[in-house]
Swiss-Prot record:
One of its GO terms (biological process) is phosphate ion transmembrane transport. GO terms for molecular function: phosphate transmembrane transporter activity. The chain crosses the membrane at residues 38-58, 69-89, 107-127, 146-166, 178-198, 213-233, 326-346, 360-380, 389-409, 437-457, 472-492, 493-513, 526-546. Its main location: membrane. Potential transporter for phosphate. This is Putative phosphate permease Rv2281. Belongs to the inorganic phosphate transporter (PiT) (TC 2.A.20) family. GO terms for cellular component: plasma membrane. Keywords: Cell membrane, Membrane, Phosphate transport, Transmembrane, Transmembrane helix, Transport. It comes from Mycobacterium tuberculosis (strain ATCC 25618 / H37Rv). Was identified as a high-confidence drug target.
């Protein structure tokens, strides 16, 4: 095995065993498989959520609301959330499951807590409709019924495209999917209503141009940051640990050989010589345990050579990287995640924090994480170095994935809940408003659908991100997730057009480039899927809109 092939294994035997288990995760397990109770539980939970929410929505929308459209919108909206869970959420947790840090069930639990919490706590109680966003509907005459048809068509088209991508294992942008659906439905409405010229003018083509730019900008930024970050981690932590462990293994073999050699030499001595040598060994054992021990006092060759071996062991500061570098990396990572939460995840909560307040919070969290990680590293002394490395990066990866999940829940669930909330608002008020209220009941229901989607159809995307694009371990998975979070945060502040999905895939590729183990062949269909996501959703939505206008 070459040095490069060896060096990228940051988890060694422990990580490899867990990786093999992750790689064997089945792509699909039927209802008769070992996870049958989980399948049944999520099926019942999904059905129960739909029934309870529909019952609540009938009362919320009022007696004058069209019940057929309300039920249809609920089904389509939950179906969209289901597919967002199978793609976006699976994409977010793919590195954690692929690295063996989390099992599928553990990832589901973390996603359920943090995704739903992010949606309910920080998702915002009001969402903007697309009236003047990617499509400006003010240029055409749109009545409430046609507006709902646009939203229904967009949700249906985006969900169907995501379902296809999930079945193929392609991580694609759910945001681009819903945007494509809205654009296609809006243009189709303009065409069928005889407003052809206005139909094309109402699309904000500069926004579409930014999406095209994001196809290149997002993976490049994610890959560049990940390449640099993981390069530092590998050079200063993983390679150092591997060299230290290799040296300790050599010293251990030397110690065993030393013992065997002296045992054989002792057996060759006469009985009188053995008695004398035993006395010398006993005196050396006492001397070696004194605080003021002087190596020159040793009488026996056994203890003199043993002292030299012990000196070699002491010269190998095996845990230096874990105590010096890992706390710094963990502190920097925690600061990035907290910054992403404060500036992106909590942006809908209007906490009233000043910029200086945010900076102090970020600094305090960074200091606390540095101290906690440093103490944790000290407690691991005496443990296997490879296992200690695996444990520390596993904790850091779970922390990063949890923060990413919360931020995702607070923002990207809007791809499903936004159009649905707009439909619900029109059914309740009979008018098209610039903003639509998002009831907490809808957030919880769609959160359940999100988690169910991760469980039922998320395995293929997890396999793609977790180990099909490149071999993933806790350190490399942490680097990919943290790089993606950092780029998303920076792009949000700078206003750059990026996609979090594309960024994370780029970050995974960056790790693979460092390890020279990137599956470029798999990237070809994934990039093609990115390019055709928007037009595919647009075509499906245009067909859906024509069908809905014919039915209703």
């Amino acid at each position: 095995m070459s040095d490069n092939a060896k060096h990228h294994r940051d988890g060694h035997l422990v990580a490899s065993g867990l990786q093999d288990r992750a790689a064997r995760t089945p792509q699909h397990e039927g209802f008769l498989g070992p996870d049958r109770p989980w399948h049944l539980s999520f099926s019942l939970l999904l059905a129960g959520s739909f029934v309870l929410f529909s019952w609540w929505a009938f009362d919320y929308a009022g007696s004058g609301a069209n019940k057929v459209i309300l039920v249809l919108a609920t089904v389509v909206g939950m179906f969209m959330a289901f597919n967002v869970g199978g793609n976006d959420v699976a994409n977010s947790f793919g590195t954690s499951v692929g690295a063996g840090t989390l099992t599928m069930k553990q990832a589901l639990l973390v996603a359920a807590i943090f995704e739903v919490s992010g949606a309910v706590i920080a998702g915002g109680d009001v969402t903007e409709t697309i009236r003047s966003g990617i499509v400006d509907l003010s240029g055409v005459s749109v009545d409430p019924r046609d507006f709902m048809n646009i939203m229904l068509s967009a949700l249906s088209a985006a969900a169907l495209w995501l379902l296809f991508a999930n079945r193929m294992g392609y991580p694609v942008s759910t945001t681009h999917s819903i945007i494509g659906g809205i654009v296609g439905a809006a243009i189709a409405l303009g065409m069928v209503s005889g407003q052809g010229g206005a139909a094309l003018r109402m699309v904000q083509w500069d926004q579409i141009g930014q999406i095209v730019v994001s196809w290149v900008l997002s993976p490049v930024l994610g890959g560049l940051v990940s390449y640099l970050l993981y390069g530092v981690i590998k050079r200063h932590i993983l390679l150092y640990n591997e060299q230290a462990e290799r040296r300790l293994t050599e010293i251990k073999k030397e110690r065993i050989a030393h013992r065997e050699r002296h045992k054989a030499a002792f057996d060759r001595l006469t009985e009188i010589q053995q008695i004398a040598y035993t006395g010398a060994l006993a005196r050396d054992a006492v001397a070696a345990n004194r605080k003021d021990f002087d190596p020159d006092e040793l009488e026996s060759d056994y203890y003199r050579e043993l002292h030299e071996i012990d000196a070699k062991t002491s010269s190998v500061d095996a845990f230096r990287a874990l105590q010096n570098w890992v706390p710094l990396v963990a502190a920097a990572g925690s600061m990035i995640i907290v910054a992403m939460l404060l500036f992106k995840g909590f942006k809908h909560m209007h906490l009233g924090l000043t910029t200086m307040n945010n900076y102090f919070i970020i600094a305090m969290v960074g200091a606390a994480v540095w101290m906690a990680t440093f103490i944790f590293a000290k407690t691991l002394r005496g443990e296997s170095l490879s296992r200690s490395t695996f444990l520390m990066f596993s904790w850091m990866q779970v922390f990063t994935a949890s923060g990413f999940a919360f931020s995702h829940g607070s923002n990207d669930i809007a791809n499903a809940i936004g159009p649905f909330a707009a439909i619900l608002d029109v059914l309740r008020t009979g008018a098209i408003e610039g903003n639509a209220a998002v009831p907490a009941a809808a957030m919880v229901t769609f959160g359940v659908a999100l988690c169910a989607g991760l469980w039922f159809i998320g395995r293929r995307v997890i396999a793609t991100v977790g180990h099909n694009l490149t071999t993933m371990h806790p350190a490399s998975g942490f680097a990919a997730e943290l790089s993606a979070a950092g780029v998303v945060m920076g792009a949000t502040v700078l206003g750059l057009p990026v996609s979090s999905t594309h960024i994370l895939i780029g970050a995974v590729l960056g790790v693979g480039i460092v390890n020279r183990s990137t599956n470029w062949g798999l990237m070809k269909p994934i990039v093609l899927a990115w390019v055709i996501t928007l037009p595919s959703a647009a075509i499906l939505a245009s067909v859906g809109l024509v069908a809905l206008r014919a039915i209703f």
